[in-house]
Amino acid sequence: MARDKQSALIVAAFVLLCSGCLCGVADGAKGGRKTKGPVIGIDLGTTYSCVGVYRNGHVDIVANDQGNRITPSWVAFTDDERLVGEAAKNQAALNPDRTIFDIKRLIGRRFDDEEVQRDVKYLPYKVVDKGGKPYVEVRVKAGEVKVFSPEEISAMILAKMKETAESYLGQRVTDAVVTVPAYFNDAQRQATKDAGTIAGLNVPRIINEPTAAAIAYGLDRKGAGEMTNVLVYDLGGGTFDVSVLSLDHGVFEVLATSGDTHLGGEDFDRRVMDHFIRLVKRQHGRDIGGDGRALGKLRRECERAKRALSRQHQVRVEIEALFVGVDFSETLTRAKFEELNMDLFKKTLGPVRKAIADAKLKKSDIDEIVLVGGSTRIPKVQELLKEMFDGKEPTKGINPDEAVAYGAAVQGSIISGEGGAETKDILLLDVTPLTLGIETAGGVMTKLIPRNTRIPVKKSQVFTTYEDHQTTVSIKVFEGERSLTKDCRELGRFDLSGIAPAPRGVPQIEVTFEVDENGILHVTASDKAAGRSKSITITNDKGRLSQEEIDRMVREAEEFAEEDRRVRERVDARNRLENYVYRMRSAVRDGGMAGKIGDDDRERMESALTEALEWLEDNDGGARTAEKEDYEEKLKEVEQVCGPIIKQVYKKSGDASAGAGDDDDVNEL
């Protein structure tokens, strides 16, 4: 742009016209339309989502149609149907390029974002650039290829949670409080609200996940007399947040927040996946990094292994037909899992220290540590946190998977007025996670709202022109803590035109930042002399959905329907054969029965079992994959060898117990 027509601003004599903060509000409905009926609470997670409803004086976490209280944040398409939740996740191995997950890591981001590009390498589905935003390209029913925005996919998950709540309540639901990571920026927050609209929901309030969890923790102790400093450590599937709050007679005041919107259980899974990808390449000379089907199988087993290692010290990772002709089977120990992820575990401690320092507290001032998110079940995470706080044990009183939805449901009850005496005195005072400002001359980040400022907040500052006779100024809005805008994240920009020509430094341009209770930023610039002004809601103007796009997506969302899952008889038949073979092998080699089998019979069984396992390896992948009937026939063959021998052993054992046997091994034990 020409410097004589449009240029940066300079601060005019450092005049700060209005720097006061507006206090938080107890009633989250003040910023939105009046609600009718229940306002549900939805925790829209990276890997799992959860919904809560407040009624009869308490919160109910609602189970889905599979009986589970958390629902996988997965969506899939087949030629005949769309699947959401467990049904989508369960068929992922067979349908990897049409199964979508981790969409929360794409929402509100630019396609060229470094983290988006890093994620895309691990995703089996296709992510394309549309208008600078990451869109998902997928083949839907009848072979039609469509592209979906992250908001649309998120809306499908929100709609599933909405339907779950409606089935439980027996009535239509139109309003929901939806949670987001505390470190989500404006674009991500607005995109989440747009997803709610597409799902047929009014979202009167966006609430930060750690704050919602603090409500779940603090509700039962609302009557406690003393003030309590609480640190919420929220490590989920894809994001990490830390918030320090003070709880005092129902007042939940966030003192500071910190975190990483790209750190969580998915990253731990990927470290394990990378480990096994290297192992497969070393053992079989094949790189499966670009094989979507193999990665899908590996991803599922790595997640299962991670969960198991929170309860046990080692787990067997077994994958049938990882690729053609190869079944994968390796042991993963807790020690190896911790070694692969130790730097990520330790990375979470930095934001903890930062949040405590920003709250102007010391470690010893923290009264309670509340763990939220499924990844906090990892023993090493708990151990590192305990060490950091000199042996202080985290609170175990709340369910880490459900606490966020619980708190969101409480906030929903406040908005709807259904909370009653239990919630009427609750006051939420949240903060901005990052500093907000504009670019001034020389690329300087001029800060208007510092991080951890209580919201809602409104601040104004007067700037002036940089060039003589400048008639247009460009307002560039950034968030971040660095002194130069090149090191911060641009949120949006707009131009204020029609400024009367004058020497530099004469015009007075007042810029006002206002952050609402949802953490969404609104910016206004006005020429004080001419009375001309312009304003925008900052939601990453380069990638924000237009109202027309949202309306179209709402219509398309209404066309999809929930359908049935695919049955996998062949896998069941294979598993029956494999389970029988390993059970018989255990009987031959271990336990009290092994000594009661004669040498000839043992040799016959070992031979049949070994042959069956070799047959499984040879007929389980590619063109040689066996069918259901083949597995059943092989099982009959093995049973014909092993069955009579085992029956004879049981018969002898029965005779021996009657005193009639002469088994040499009776007294071995």
From Swiss-Prot:
<keyword id="KW-0143">Chaperone</keyword>
<dbReference type="GO" id="GO:0034663">
    <property type="term" value="C:endoplasmic reticulum chaperone complex"/>
</dbReference>
<dbReference type="InterPro" id="IPR043129">
    <property type="entry name" value="ATPase_NBD"/>
</dbReference>
<dbReference type="GO" id="GO:0036503">
    <property type="term" value="P:ERAD pathway"/>
</dbReference>
<feature type="short sequence motif" description="Prevents secretion from ER">
    <location>
        <begin position="666"/>
        <end position="669"/>
    </location>
</feature>
<dbReference type="Pfam" id="PF00012">
    <property type="entry name" value="HSP70"/>
</dbReference>
<keyword id="KW-0256">Endoplasmic reticulum</keyword>
<dbReference type="GO" id="GO:0005737">
    <property type="term" value="C:cytoplasm"/>
</dbReference>
<protein>
    <recommendedName>
        <fullName>Heat shock 70 kDa protein BIP2</fullName>
    </recommendedName>
</protein>
<comment type="function">
    <text>Functions as a chaperone during endoplasmic reticulum (ER) stress response.</text>
</comment>
<dbReference type="GO" id="GO:0030968">
    <property type="term" value="P:endoplasmic reticulum unfolded protein response"/>
</dbReference>
<feature type="signal peptide">
    <location>
        <begin position="1"/>
        <end position="28"/>
    </location>
</feature>
<comment type="similarity">
    <text>Belongs to the heat shock protein 70 family.</text>
</comment>
<dbReference type="GO" id="GO:0044183">
    <property type="term" value="F:protein folding chaperone"/>
</dbReference>
<dbReference type="GO" id="GO:0042026">
    <property type="term" value="P:protein refolding"/>
</dbReference>
<keyword id="KW-0547">Nucleotide-binding</keyword>
<dbReference type="GO" id="GO:0031072">
    <property type="term" value="F:heat shock protein binding"/>
</dbReference>
<dbReference type="InterPro" id="IPR013126">
    <property type="entry name" value="Hsp_70_fam"/>
</dbReference>
<keyword id="KW-0346">Stress response</keyword>
<dbReference type="GO" id="GO:0005788">
    <property type="term" value="C:endoplasmic reticulum lumen"/>
</dbReference>
<dbReference type="GO" id="GO:0005524">
    <property type="term" value="F:ATP binding"/>
</dbReference>
<dbReference type="GO" id="GO:0016887">
    <property type="term" value="F:ATP hydrolysis activity"/>
</dbReference>
<dbReference type="GO" id="GO:0016020">
    <property type="term" value="C:membrane"/>
</dbReference>
<dbReference type="InterPro" id="IPR029048">
    <property type="entry name" value="HSP70_C_sf"/>
</dbReference>
<keyword id="KW-0067">ATP-binding</keyword>
<keyword id="KW-0732">Signal</keyword>
<dbReference type="InterPro" id="IPR018181">
    <property type="entry name" value="Heat_shock_70_CS"/>
</dbReference>
<dbReference type="InterPro" id="IPR029047">
    <property type="entry name" value="HSP70_peptide-bd_sf"/>
</dbReference>
<dbReference type="GO" id="GO:0051085">
    <property type="term" value="P:chaperone cofactor-dependent protein refolding"/>
</dbReference>
<dbReference type="InterPro" id="IPR042050">
    <property type="entry name" value="BIP_NBD"/>
</dbReference>
<dbReference type="GO" id="GO:0140662">
    <property type="term" value="F:ATP-dependent protein folding chaperone"/>
</dbReference>
<dbReference type="GO" id="GO:0005634">
    <property type="term" value="C:nucleus"/>
</dbReference>
